[in-house]
Curated annotation (Swiss-Prot):
Entry's Gene Ontology molecular function annotations: actin filament binding; ATP binding; guanyl-nucleotide exchange factor activity; microfilament motor activity
Domain notes: DH (RhoGEF) domain interacts with Rac1-related GTPases.
Assembly, per entry: Monomer.
Ranges of compositional bias, category Polar residues: 1143-1153, 1180-1198, 1274-1288
Binding-site residues, ATP: G154, E155, S156, G157, S158, G159, K160, T161
Biased composition (Basic and acidic residues): 947-1028, 1121-1131
Name this polypeptide is given: Myosin-M heavy chain
SS bonds (residue pairs): none
Predominant subcellular localization, coarse grouping: cytoplasm
InterPro entries, sorted: DBL_dom_sf, DH_dom, Kinesin_motor_dom_sf, Myosin_head_motor_dom-like, Myosin_N, P-loop_NTPase, PH-like_dom_sf, PH_domain
Gene name, Swiss-Prot/TrEMBL: myoM
Residue ranges of every copy of the DH domain listed in the record: 1389-1572
Amino acid sequence: MKHLEGDIVWVPHTVNGYCRGKIIGYNEKNQVTVRLLELNEEIKINEQLIQNYNQSDDKDFSDMVEIQDLSEAIILNNLGLRYKSDQIYTYIGNVLISINPYKEIKDIYSLNILNKYKDINTIKSNPPHIYAVALRAYQSMVSEKKNQSIIISGESGSGKTEASKTILQYLINTSNSNSNNNTNINNNNNSIEKDILNSNPILEAFGNSRTTKNHNSSRFGKFLKIEFRSSDMKIDGASIETYLLEKSRISHRPDVNNLSYHIFYYLVMGASKEERERLGLDNDPSKYRYLDASTSVIESFKKQSNGGSGGGSGNNDLSESLQLVKQSLESMSIAKEQCDDIFLTLAAILHLGNIEFEVDQTENEQTSGFSKISEQKASVKKSLSMVSKLLGYPEQVFKQTLLNRNLKGGGRGSVYCRPMEVYQSEQTRDALSKALYVRLFASIVEKINVKFIQNTGSKDLQGGYSSKRNNLFIGVLDIFGFENLSSNSLDQLLINFTNEKLQQQFNLNVFENEQKDYLQEGIPWSTSNFIDNKECIELFEKKSYGLLSLLDDECMMPKGSEVTLLEKYNKQYHNTNQYYQRTLAKGTLGIKHFAGDVTYQTDGWLEKNRDSIPTEVEQLLSASSNNLIKSLFNLKELNKSNDNNSNNNNSNNNSSSSSSSQSTASITAKASPPRERFNSGSGSGTTSPLNLSGSSSPLSGSGSYSIIGGNSNSNSNNNNSSNNKKSQSVSVAGQFIEQLNKLISTINSTSVHYIRCIKPNVTMDCNNFNNSHVLSQLRNVGVLNTVKVRKMGYSYRRDFIQFYSRYNCILNSLNIKINLTNINHSNLCKEILENVNSQYKNNNNNKNNNNQIVKITTNSKPTFQIGKTKIFISDELYIYLEKKRYDSLVDSVLKIQAFFKMIKIRNQYKRNKESSLFLQTLIRAQRAKKDFEQLVILENKRKEEERKKELERQRKEEEERQKELERQRREEEKELERKRKEEERELERQRKEEEKEQERKRKEEEKEQERKKKEEKEIEKKRKEEEKKKKKNEQNLSLPSLDITNSPSLINTTTTTTTTTTTTTNTSSPPLSPPISPRPSTPSSTSSSSSTTSSPSTKKQLLFKFNSISNLLSKSLHGSSHSDKNSKEDNNSNNNNNGDSTIILSSDSSFGQPTPKATSTPTPPPPPPLKTQPVPISSGVENNSSPNLWSHRNSPNFNGLVREKSRARIGRLTIRSASPLDLTYLPDPSKNEGSPQFTSQSLDFTPNIPPIITNSIVEQQSSLSGINKPIPQRTISSSENSPLSRANSSISSSLLILTPTLTSLSTSTTPSTPTTPKTPTTLSSSSVSTSTSLSSVSSSVSSSSSSSIPTPIIESTPSNSNEDLITTLSSPISTGHTGESIEEKNKRFRIKIINELIETERDYVRDLNIVVEVFLNPIREKQLLSAKDINSLFSNIEILFSINMNVLKALEKDKDPLCENISVGQTFLDMSHYLKMYTTYCSNQQNALKILEEEKIKNQPFREYLEFCMNDSVCRGLPLNSFIIKPVQRICKYPLLIKETIKFTPNDHPDKPALEEVDKKISDIVQSINEAKRTLELFQKIVDLQNSIDGLEDTNLMEQGRTLLMEGTVSAVKELNSEDSLSRTLFLFNNLILICSFGTNVLSTAINQFKTKKLKLKAKIPISDSRLIFVSDTDSVKYALEIVNIKEDSNYILCFNNDQDRSKWFKQIKALIQEQKLSNAKKAATIGNSRLIQTTS
């Protein structure tokens, strides 16, 4: 409804509930600014929350139904007004609202006031009072002959108990009952009225306690029936039914500010000294665990106690309160002995609470886990003794019952005793205490009911007392109100369900009152407006599927739990019942009650619903010597009582409907079911030995209902056993539902009257009205539901005059004419409503669609009704009426304002018009002139600017055109210049090549001619001195070990021998076929050898021949190769000269490879040999001449010569190996002569056979079979395996040893039968080469003069035949790529690189699969990490695996051994758009490794799983972090592989463009990754360095190196952080690698771990002593390492600590290569000098 500015409205307020406010203004979004009148402050609030304020309603209403605009705000305001004037009672219809004043109000309950409410006709004239409610109930019973009920509800402390007592006093006074009944044979001179009053102190003492909210809080529900004789309506009897006694208050109170039941404090602090001594009690409550509380609270309780009522302000002590209870018990015909037994039971409960338990220990002080009675306190033993004494059984038996539990065995009658734990014993103790009190309370209630029967009833045929069936009753229900605590359990669920049932009944009652009002006014009434909470109630009590039924079912399950119960609730009612709410919190559910939404915690529901005590404890109590205790737990008497009550119930059910269900059948005691808040036990037998009368329970098999779980029949022991089990299955919820249904059934059969008690404040202060607290209670008790019911109908009801006076302002807008002489308010009101209603419907028709129109016209109720005296208006029409009124008032105000504004403006206009007319004329003329001039100037400026812009545009276009022409001209010039230069370069290159070719041919022809001439001369000399040569050869074969440096004659002999052996070469012989069979010397050869002599002419010939050999060796060293023509001429020449043939012993492992051109630059040395300890690197170039350059310190295995087995490039691209014949020189410091020692470790030489010199040339006779033509040569660096190059006269020594031996082999020209050697061996392919020269050997001889290395001593082993050497050299020879062209060589390399790339991709896919299958999927399935951490740790690893799998399939698609059809470039180009994933993966890598380290520290399951994976053979011992970094490492390797593929791919190959494009893309990605970029650059430098060493390209050990690499198993890799500055060392085991740091526990732990696995620690190599091997990073365990085999066949990997160490190593590599190049250059110069000297000689 629209409100005007300045209107007074009701505004919601958090503290005051509602406040009056004045509207100041409207804001955007329906926000209203209101000034609160009481608080003088401004707030902004939504317009929808404002409630209408009617000044006529702002006054004191005794009946709030009279309020016209009934709302929450006006109800709250009216109650506050009346409370301030001490008017605590207010009507709202037939509901009485009572507010607790917390003070005495004078004469409010005096006899005079009571007498005013004796006449029913004076009720409306008298103010509201609780007497009026009692009077209305009494008169209704009298006049209608119908039972009545008065329901009193409200929260604790609102005055419910006092209200019930007030009603009881009124009814007793009104009935004028006689003091006794003459028909009662047991006339005790006590009237029923007195009995009813005397029962109140007993019930309050045993059922009330002090809480923080109420000093006399009833902890149970009570329904008191006061019966009246139908003849004279005098009180004739009474009965009490109790509900939900709070038994948990016995053992567990919320805090020290809450006390236990009053009776305990009366007994402790009010009993006499003799009584305390007899009961063993002390007068201090703090000495009892069940009573201990705050001292201030106990003192306050003593002051406020008044005769047990607890409600007064007297100063009576507790002895008087205890005495009042005793007197009340005696008045209930309870004998003194029975009273003593009651107090004895109470004392036993207190002593029982002081029994403490502790864990029992065995003799050796070990904990057994079972409980025992605490022996540390003497008070515990005293309490145990007192409990046994008071309850009437032996102490030891009771003790065993608390400590042990009996279990039935599988056999017949077998029972086992099982000790209990401490908590179980404590639970048994507390359960026993609660059971004793609850059953004692029920027994007292039963005795009170029996007393009521004795005073009013008569004996039946069986001698018992029965009530008359035709009596009427008035029931007073004192029930707990709605509860919504911070923690709500099963107790609150049952309480709120009770209030739901009562609210349903209340709604029905209000509905009937509304119907009555409508019928009086003649208004049609529809039941569709009824507010019903039936669905909410069915949610609780629906059979089989209700909340309580499901709870009972779950309690019967063997493994039932609250979790499964909640799952059943959610499955059954989630999204199917609007009142059930599924909550997010664990173990909770929500219910939408009429008073608000409540969240319940399900913890402990099953135990509370069962609420049992051990059977042995109950059996022990039933056998007590105490009569009271025995009667409380005697099953036979209980069953008898059940049978009697069942018979009474059956007879009562046959009575008429008006009185049968509420007459004397209900006077038997009705005990309450237990609960933890208001609780008493069910199946445990913890309640009164009584039955509830009435209809049979749906949970019980008989017509009666046993509260304690007793038997319906006790005819036999078997029946007792079976029935006991059956009754024990009845739960607390089942008892509660049955009792509640009976109560509601009883109430529904009566006329109900309501009293809603309100607590004005929380602090229980007088004259303090807390609006917000009162408002919440009004909602909880259902008062505001009355407002809702009215608003569902016609909430606005006014008489005709009031309506006309308010809405007569809209008559003009409605065009309604009024007859002022005769005004008919009824007709005018009707005419106004009809016109407004018509407009309202028209507006709805314009706004709504056709469906909504049909709904309005057919389904909606009439918007107004006109009664006899009132007008009933709906909310919608009322809002529209108020809007029309507002619009009418606004329209009137606007018209008035417009009229006065018009007059004012008109007068002002006339005054200003004449004075301004002249001035306006002048000003306008001057302004027009200036405007014209300004327009002319602006127009000129505009034209000038346009002209300039046009000229500027033309100029720029011309400049652009000229620039374009100039650019085209320059491009043409550059293109022409480029073509010209290319043509010139091409011509110049061709010219130079032709000149070089001509010069080379010329020189070769000259040399060939000169060589032929010399050979012709030598042939002549050979013929003359042949006999002399033979004799000298025989002498040389018998020589011992010679020293070439000390015997000049040896040189002469060598020269002669060399000259002689050159005459038997046969170049046309077939290739040498392994093995070479040695031939025996013929007799002719022996005689020839013996006839040879030494003469000056012979020496001259030998010198000439030696110079020829030196020239050949020099040509080979400097790359001089013969052309095809010269080769043919040489062959022809050799054929003419008896077919000379040469055998070359080479160190090339790749023999058979085509011989590349030799360059003038000497090749650097290869890395040191394999099969040895690492050789240290020289620190700089300064130590190049050091004799210990290649020395190895601390080599325990061997000294001297070592060889190189393999050498690796980065990755697997160019892993090479050297020849097994390579020799290394090393001075032996152990020998005094300082002579170097030579050793070979590749061939199987014996110590007696001298080593074979690398690249030596021997001539062989043509008579050797299998040698037909020369084997192609391999150019050998002068420094390769280079100790020979540094030795003086080493070549001469070699020739000395080899020439005679081989010469002797060639003396015979006729084939003969071969002789089998004693120790045959084969000649390795790596020891024989096909074409060579003696230049390298000659250079070694020449360089001896400038070398500082001592001359080596070569020892010769004596040999008597030529077979020894041949036997030693007989090794297999493999065929090589003879005459291979460059294209074929490139093709071969391309195949190897592509195969390497496929293997690399295969390894990569395998590693990615390991990450996904071994790590990612199990971690995700086992939920070892969160989803976020898994995404951060593994990033795009699954996508990368899929992509690379597709790449591998594409590469392996064509099984082409030549790799011609494999499109490497196109394959990688197809996946290039995924390359950016590597950038993302790399940027996330640091965070991933950080998460990995953190989770390994704090996440034990994750850490254990990683350790488990380390032991998995699939992972090869690599940790997870090594696999995580593999994608970035792999993308860094691709550029090298792609570049190598491009290098050996022809330009016309179809895959070449794709390769170049993908190379650019991958390189760009790699460059963007900082770490990968650094690694790639470092790899490239190493590749460039190794490319500078000659001979590496011809080595083919790539597959062998890969095999070695993959065989190495990495067990564990420990990575150090960047902050660690400790030096790193690599510890090696059997193929197990561990990277650690010094000074940490990781090292010792790892070593101990390997020792326990019986793994031997083999080596420890610091960086300073490492081999020449390289690892770019400690993480690159697979991609940048070289595996070196030592004697123990372990794997060495070098890991650098930092970039400085790596840079130092890199410099050492450079220095070594430069040193080797310089050494080669010096040796080449020495060879030239040697040749010059020989020629001169």
